[in-house]
Amino acid sequence: AGEMGDNLNFLDLPGSASAITAGDGFTCSIVDDSGTDKAFCWGLNDIGQLGIENTNNVGDGSGGSMSSINNVDLVYSSQPAVVQSIDAGEDHVCAIVQYGSYRPVQCWGNGADGRLGYGSQDNRGTGAGSTNGMGSNLGYVRLSSGTTGYYHVTDIEAGAGTTCVIM
């Protein structure tokens, strides 16, 4: 009793998942997509927590279809980031990304109380543009003064409305 057994559907992700994290009504995973580890998120997306520049939910159709899933747009100088680590809070997500030898943090979703670390309460990932967009519009979180505050993060943990890192 209470077991899902053979009745549980598998998600059709674009590659093998190496990590998974869940927030309130949504899930994100690091997926090997054609040899590059990228972030993919699905579920509730009312404040941009899926990082897809809109507020449309993903994967809420019948049969677990993921046909509308796209990777989170994390780039630097037109080069896609390699996602090293990812963690979801209640309604925001932060990831350690790798660009060459650098390992900065990028966050998206609910910006209330400064939980994303960008010095504002703006939500990120809700639409295209310099304030709430992804890709080249999504900067790194400044964790301390100088360049080392951007580039040498080793671990990350997101809570309901907070995010902590180890540098």
Predicted features and spans:
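A short helix->beta-strand "capping" segment at the edge of beta-propeller domains
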Residues: 4-12, 67-69, 135-140
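Short glycine-/Asp-/Thr-/Trp-enriched loop segments that recur within the blades
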Residues: 3, 14-16, 76-81, 144-152
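Residue-level signature of beta-propeller blades and closely related beta-rich strand-turn architectures
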Residues: 33-34, 45, 99-100, 111
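Disulfide-stabilized cysteine-rich extracellular repeat microdomains
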Residues: 9, 16, 25, 46-47, ...
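Short glycine/serine- and acidic-residue-enriched loop/turn motifs that recur at repeat junctions
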Residues: 1-4, 40-66, 106-135
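Conserved core positions of repeat-based scaffolds
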Residues: 26-29, 41, 92-95, 107, ...
